[in-house]
């Protein structure tokens, strides 16, 4: 019986080996290209959907927005934009009207690690107390709160915090063109055929 299993294993290994459907590549995996997401249309929709001011931060050159989604924090709605930084780290900002004292509210084990001042705004820092938990900064922007979370370094967290503070809230009443459709100008508008 064992001999039969060995023969079957060898037959399968040889068959798969010749087809090239299986490969062995030791070493660290390489990251593929970052999938870029245009955050502007999402933020414009969110500005109409939620009851707090929503901002689109102007991030440093080399950063790529790669995710957008709505969520919940401390029982309140959130607007979330994720970025891959120029160094390849992931960092996201969550905007909400939940109270700063209730954040972060994801139930993950973090320890409060003091505060840092970014251009006059105090951000409370939380460091992970266990593996697979990201660090977090929470800032009160007055009319909303921002939660920065990710694998970025202090400089990248500071850059995103400053960008959030400088960003103006999106006007929910402003009409935004549909970016997926080309816009016609008055000179391009087709006229009715002459009779």
Where are the regions that the model predicts?
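A short, solvent-exposed beta-edge/loop patch
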Residues: 16, 112-195
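Generic hydrophobic secondary-structure signal
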Residues: 2-12, 16-18, 54, 59, ...
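Surface-exposed beta-strand edges and their flanking turn/coil or helix-capping segments
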Residues: 29, 80, 94-98, 105-109, ...
């Amino acid at each position: 019986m064992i001999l039969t299993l060995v023969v079957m294993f060898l037959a399968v290994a040889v068959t798969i080996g010749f087809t090239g459907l299986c490969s062995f590549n030791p070493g660290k995996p390489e990251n593929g290209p970052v999938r870029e997401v245009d955050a502007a249309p999402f933020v414009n929709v969110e500005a109409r959907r939620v009851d707090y001011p929503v901002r689109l931060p102007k991030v440093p050159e080399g950063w790529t927005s790669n995710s957008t989604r709505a969520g919940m924090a401390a029982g309140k709605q959130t607007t979330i934009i994720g970025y891959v930084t120029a160094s390849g780290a992931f960092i996201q900002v969550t905007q909400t009207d939940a109270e700063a004292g209730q954040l972060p509210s994801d139930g993950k084990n973090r320890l409060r690690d003091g505060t840092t001042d970014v251009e006059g705004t105090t951000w409370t820092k939380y460091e992970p107390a266990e593996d697979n938990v990201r660090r977090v900064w929470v800032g009160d922007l007055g009319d909303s709160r921002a939660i920065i979370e990710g694998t970025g370094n202090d400089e990248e967290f500071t850059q995103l915090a400053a960008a959030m503070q400088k960003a103006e809230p999106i006007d929910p009443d402003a009409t935004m063109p549909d970016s997926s459709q080309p816009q016609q100008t008055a000179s391009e508008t087709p006229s009715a055929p002459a009779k």
